[in-house]
C-alpha cells in the first residue's frame, strides 16, 4: 500500500515538475528577452542548415556521380531526414512567429522604445527584415516544390540531383529567381547573424562593429556559394 502511494506521489511530482517547467518556459517566452532567445536559437539552427545545404550544393562541381551519390545517401536514412525536416519546419515557424511578435512590440513601444542614441541610424538590412522575411518564405516554398518534390520541375527525376539542378538552371528565368532570392537571404542573414550575437549578450561598443563585419562577410561568402551554382550552369561550366 505504502509503495503504491509512493509511486503515485512520485508520478504526481513529476507531472507537477513538468507543468511548472512548461509554465516557466511560457512566461520566459512572453518577455522580450525570451522572444529574442527563440529568434537566436532558431536562427542558429537555420544558419547551420544553410551551411550544410550549401556544402551539398557545391558537390555539383565534383560531377554527376558524386552529386547523385550524395542525394541517394541523404535519402537512404528516411527517419533522420524527416527528423531534420521537422526540426527545420518548427524552427522556421518559431522564428517567424517570434519575429512578428517582436516587430509588433517594437511598433507599440514607439517613439519611446528602442530609441537609443547609438541605434538611431539603422542599416538597410535591418529596416527590410520584415519585408524580406515573407519573400524568402515564398521562395522556400517554391524551392521545395521545384527541386525537392519536383512539382514545378517538368524534367524532374527522383534522386538525380545533378541532372535536376542542371536542367533547372539552364533556364535563365529560373536562375534569376534563385540569384535574386539568395541575395535577399544574404541581406537577411547579414543582419540576423549579428543580431543573434547581440541577443545572447555580445553587445559592446568595441566589438559590435567587428561582429557586424564578420556577420556580413560570412553571410555573403555563404550566399556566393549558393549563387555560384546557377551562374556556373548558365556559363556552361557545369553541364
Regions found by a protein language model. Name each.
Residues 2-239:
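Membrane-embedded alpha-helical bundles that constitute the cytochrome b-like, heme-associated redox core
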Amino acid at each position: 500500500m505504502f509503495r503504491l502511494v509512493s509511486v503515485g506521489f512520485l508520478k504526481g511530482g513529476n507531472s507537477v515538475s513538468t507543468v511548472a517547467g512548461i509554465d516557466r518556459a511560457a512566461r520566459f517566452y512572453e518577455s522580450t528577452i525570451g522572444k529574442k532567445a527563440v529568434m537566436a536559437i532558431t536562427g542558429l539552427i537555420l544558419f547551420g542548415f544553410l551551411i550544410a545545404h550549401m556544402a551539398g550544393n557545391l558537390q555539383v562541381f565534383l560531377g554527376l556521380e558524386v552529386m547523385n551519390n550524395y542525394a541517394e545517401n541523404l535519402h537512404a536514412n528516411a527517419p533522420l531526414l524527416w527528423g531534420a525536416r521537422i526540426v527545420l519546419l518548427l524552427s522556421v515557424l518559431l522564428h517567424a512567429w517570434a519575429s512578428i511578435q517582436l516587430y509588433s512590440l517594437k511598433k507599440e513601444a514607439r517613439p519611446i522604445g528602442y530609441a537609443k542614441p547609438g541605434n538611431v541610424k539603422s542599416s538597410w538590412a535591418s529596416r527590410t527584415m520584415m519585408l524580406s522575411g515573407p519573400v524568402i518564405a515564398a521562395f522556400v516554398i517554391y524551392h521545395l516544390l521545384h527541386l525537392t518534390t519536383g512539382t514545378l520541375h517538368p524534367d524532374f527525376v527522383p534522386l538525380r540531383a545533378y541532372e535536376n539542378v542542371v536542367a533547372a538552371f539552364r533556364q535563365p528565368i529560373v536562375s534569376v529567381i534563385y540569384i535574386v532570392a539568395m541575395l535577399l537571404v544574404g541581406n537577411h542573414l547579414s543582419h540576423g547573424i549579428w543580431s543573434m550575437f547581440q541577443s545572447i549578450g555580445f553587445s559592446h561598443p568595441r566589438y559590435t562593429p567587428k561582429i557586424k563585419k564578420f556577420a556580413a562577410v560570412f553571410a555573403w561568402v555563404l550566399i556566393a556559394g549558393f549563387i555560384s551554382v546557377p551562374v556556373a550552369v548558365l556559363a556552361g561550366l557545369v553541364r
